[in-house]
């Protein structure tokens, strides 16, 4: 029997991916204050630190626990800047104006914590957006509801704005499943054992 998996995230996309792969889990959202981690120019180091701190925060809420705690963090990186979730609609509009007709990176780092042993892994995918007309940006944000998405777009509802996706689409959604598989293998756990 596999160890219980605790998802330390309220992300609907991460939940969806685990459900899609029939991985049973419980949710204990991390209440970690992300502003405690400052960005120093390295998107991978930044997201790994955030994922790690979220895992530690969940372990404090759910201790002691003979379980696997899984957390993650996703950002968009372009031209030396990072884009997280927009603060408001005006911020979302500005993000899409910056990212349109460009190729940018989507970086997701995940952390797996078990009995004090922390493992982190990252994946980067490239996304190219189309030249979204100014008069379509606001309607896209309103229709799709992208204020909860880093970069202010949703790859699952990107039909008219996505030109190209290079890399793992699960990474873009917030949970690179192969990275999770490799991290669990380092703990001698096979992700296949979780699938029903």
From Swiss-Prot:
Query: Which residues are catalytic?
Result: 73 (proton acceptor)
Entry's InterPro entries? Answer: ITPase-like_fam, Maf-like
Q: What is this protein called?
A: Nucleoside triphosphate pyrophosphatase
Q: Does the keyword ATP-binding apply?
A: no
Q: Name one GO cellular component term.
A: cytoplasm
* Transmembrane parts of this sequence: none
- Give the source species: Chlamydia pneumoniae (Chlamydophila pneumoniae)
- Which family, according to UniProt? Belongs to the Maf family.
Q: What is its EC number?
A: 3.6.1.9
**GO MF terms, alphabetically ordered:** nucleoside triphosphate diphosphatase activity
Highest taxon above the source species: Bacteria
Catalysed reaction, written as an equation: a ribonucleoside 5'-triphosphate + H2O = a ribonucleoside 5'-phosphate + diphosphate + H(+); a 2'-deoxyribonucleoside 5'-triphosphate + H2O = a 2'-deoxyribonucleoside 5'-phosphate + diphosphate + H(+)
């Amino acid at each position: 029997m596999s160890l219980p998996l605790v998802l330390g995230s309220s992300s609907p996309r991460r939940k969806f991916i685990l459900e899609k792969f029939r991985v049973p889990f419980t949710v204990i959202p991390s209440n970690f204050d992300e502003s405690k981690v400052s960005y120093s120019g390295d998107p991978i180091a930044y997201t790994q630190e955030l994922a790690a701190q979220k895992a530690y925060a969940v372990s404090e809420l759910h201790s002691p626990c003979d379980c696997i705690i899984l957390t993650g963090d996703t950002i968009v990186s372009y031209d030396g800047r990072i884009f997280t979730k927009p603060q408001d609609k005006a911020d979302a509009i500005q993000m899409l104006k910056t990212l349109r007709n460009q190729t940018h990176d989507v970086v997701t780092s995940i952390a797996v914590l078990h009995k004090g042993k922390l493992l982190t892994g990252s994946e980067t995918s490239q996304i190219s957006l189309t030249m979204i007309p100014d008069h379509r940006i606001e309607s896209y944000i309103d229709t799709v509801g992208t204020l909860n998405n880093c970069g202010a777009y949703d790859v699952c509802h990107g039909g008219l704005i996505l030109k190209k996706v290079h890399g793992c689409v699960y990474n873009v959604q917030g949970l690179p499943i192969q990275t999770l598989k490799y991290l669990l293998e380092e703990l001698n756990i096979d992700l296949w054992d979780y699938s029903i």
